[in-house]
C-alpha cells in the first residue's frame, strides 16, 4: 500500500492553486470543481484538488513501483525548465519544448530521430571523425543536434510507450493527450477552469499558469515517483545507498509492467468536515489579509 502523504490545503492555497481563469473563459465541464468566483475570477475548490492530487500521486507511485515509465509533458514557457528539472530528479522522462506529432503514435519515426541525434553527437565528439568536414558543415551538424535535443533530450532513453502521462495544461498539450488516449495510456493532468477534463483519468483541479503552482505540482509528482522507485528497488534487492546515483539506469533496465487504467474520478465524494473547515478558514484568512493590505 502507498505511503503517499495527504496533500495540505494550506500549501495549495499558498501556491495559488485556487486561482482559475476569468469567469468569461471557463469550460462548463469544470463546473463541479469550482468553489465560486471573486473579482470575476473562478476560485477552484481546493478540497477536491487536495483529494484528487492524492489519488494522482498514488497512480504515479504505483506505476513506478511496478517498473513503469512516466512521461511528464508541458511545453509552456513557465513550466518548461521546472518539468525537466523534476523529471530528471526522479529518473523519469519528459517533453518540455515542442511536442512532435506522433511522439507516441508514430514511435518508429521518433526512434529514427533519436538515432540520428546519437550519431550526430558521436560525430561531433570525435575529432578524427570531423576531419574532412568544412567549418560550415560542422556548424550545420551542431545546429541540427541542438534542435533535436530540444525535442528529444527527455525521451531519448524511452524505448517504448510510457505507462503513464503527466500533463500540465491540457489545452496546450491536447495532441499529446489525444495520442495517449489512442494508445490507452492513462493520463494524470492539472485541469484549470478553462480545461476539458473528459479524457483525463486522474484530473487535478488547479492553476496551470502560476510558476509557484507548477513547481509544487512537479515536486509532489517527483516525490511520488521516487517513493515508487524506492519500493521497486527494495523488491529487486538493489542497494538503496546507490539509488539516487543509478536512478535512470535502474528504471531503464527493468521490465515494464502495464498499469491497468483506473476508473475516472469526475468529482470527489464525502469530503470530511475537517477538510471543509480547513479550506474555508484558509480562504477567509486570505480575504482578511487582502483587506488589511488595502486598508
Swiss-Prot record:
Protein name: Small ribosomal subunit protein uS2
Family from the record: Belongs to the universal ribosomal protein uS2 family.
GO cellular component labels: small ribosomal subunit
Gene Ontology terms, MF aspect: structural constituent of ribosome
Matches recorded under SUPFAM superfamilies: Ribosomal protein S2
Keywords: Ribonucleoprotein, Ribosomal protein
Keyword flag Ribosomal protein: yes
InterPro entries from the UniProt entry: Ribosomal_uS2 (IPR001865), Ribosomal_uS2_bac/mit/plastid (IPR005706), Ribosomal_uS2_CS (IPR018130), Ribosomal_uS2_flav_dom_sf (IPR023591)
CDD domains: RPS2
